[in-house]
Amino acid sequence: MIRMKHVLFTLSTLLLAPPVSVSAADLPSTLMDPYLRIHVSLADDKMDGVVVSAKAMSDVAQKLGPQAQPVSQSATKLATAKDLKAARTAFGELSDAMVAYAKATGATFGRDINVAVCPMVQKPWLQKGTTITNPYFGKSMLTCGEIKKG
């Protein structure tokens, strides 16, 4: 009888426990991987994977709490983009939200991630490495921009 109570207690504890949320340590893989896929696609003048990656980012950001809501909202908007122009505009909002989220939470994105800025649109983006690949103008102005901080 004691064992049965122990089993029932253990099961009820597991079932009633709050869902596990994504922690700051998970940010590089859960937010940065889809973000970087979007960046690469837009820099290459393509929409390949943009919608799927934006939806994934929105889902992850929803689990991170109120500070990540701008990331979730921006990613959701990007997921509805119908063309490159709309996607690039939404990506600018998403990039602003990502930078703000990192500042607000003290998160570091690691993995050689740098903040770059396009002087033409005055918008940042996060990218791997220091070789500029501008997602706002793609191949027509691929190297336009500068690294702001590493």
Segments the model singles out, each with a brief description of its role:
Residues 1-14:
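Bacterial N-terminal signal peptides that target proteins for export
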Residues 16, 20-150:
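Intrinsically disordered, low-complexity terminal tails/loops enriched in metal-binding residues
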